[in-house]
């Protein structure tokens, strides 16, 4: 393991330092970045063997965009996504468009950092299995949502009215109401005639999909 270089790209300062300390204790040489711009600069300077990438990096490029850019210049680089987002559909990225040979770990699914160490090592060796693809886990949060349901919930979370959603999707308001009803059922929100239904659905969607960031909980 000695001599392998890793770049950590994570905008949560506490988690970033926790990961760096752990990786250094395992013998890696580590550099860290809090945003895509710094990550691209450090990647060019250090030519790391692997990159641990958060997906939600704030304004600008997300982790998926950044991974494609980095792999264009160094295709053999190991990529480990470490994120609160269950799968790429929730940030409007087709799962089939993700780079091959990656690991995808949900922060909430890590009981300790040994899984991350194993994932990084396996990915560097080009031996990734489905066990390291949490985005393909059939039991992941909201795995049952369709593409349309995700789109409707996303637009609701942006404060769009039913009329606005209908206009964006090119459908009728009635079709939107039906899509919202089925989306609420899919995520376990009571769709009774209650003004809180929409608020509850949006809150649950944002929380479970990782689009509202909790505090760092990986130990």
Can you say where each PLM-predicted feature lies in the sequence?
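The C-terminal output helix
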Residues: 119-137
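Alpha4 helix (beta4-alpha4-beta5 surface) of REC/receiver domains from two-component response regulators
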Residues: 65, 85-106, 111-114
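Acidic, metal-coordinating helix/loop segments flanking the phosphotransfer/catalytic sites
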Residues: 32-50
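Helix-turn-helix DNA-binding segment
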Residues: 134-181
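Two-component/phosphorelay signaling modules centered on CheY-like receiver
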Residues: 12-31
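Acidic catalytic/metal-coordinating carboxylates
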Residues: 35, 59-65
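Basic, Lys/Arg-enriched C-terminal extension of HTH/homeodomain DNA-binding domains
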Residues: 182-219
């Amino acid at each position: 393991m000695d001599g392998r270089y890793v770049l950590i790209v994570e905008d949560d300062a506490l988690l970033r330092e926790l990961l760096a300390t752990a990786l250094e204790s395992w013998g890696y040489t580590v550099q860290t970045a809090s945003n895509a711009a710094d990550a691209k600069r450090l990647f060019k300077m250090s030519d790391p063997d692997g990159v641990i990438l958060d997906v939600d990096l704030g304004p600008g490029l997300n982790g998926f965009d950044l991974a494609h850019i980095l792999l264009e210049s160094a295709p053999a680089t190991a990529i480990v996504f470490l994120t609160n987002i269950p799968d790429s559909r929730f940030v409007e990225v087709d799962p089939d468009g993700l780079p091959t040979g990656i690991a995808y770990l949900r922060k909430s699914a890590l009981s300790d950092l040994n899984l991350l160490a194993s994932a990084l090592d396996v990915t560097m060796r080009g031996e990734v299995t489905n066990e390291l693809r949490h985005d393909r886990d059939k039991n992941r949060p909201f795995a049952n949502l369709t593409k349309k349901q995700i789109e409707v919930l996303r637009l609701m979370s942006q404060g769009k009215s039913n009329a606005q959603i209908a206009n964006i999707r090119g459908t009728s308001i009635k079709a939107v109401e039906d899509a919202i009803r089925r989306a609420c059922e899919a995520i376990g929100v009571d769709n009774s005639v209650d003004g809180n239904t929409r608020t509850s659905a949006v809150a649950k969607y944002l929380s479970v999909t990782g689009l509202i960031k909790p505090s760092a909980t990986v130990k």
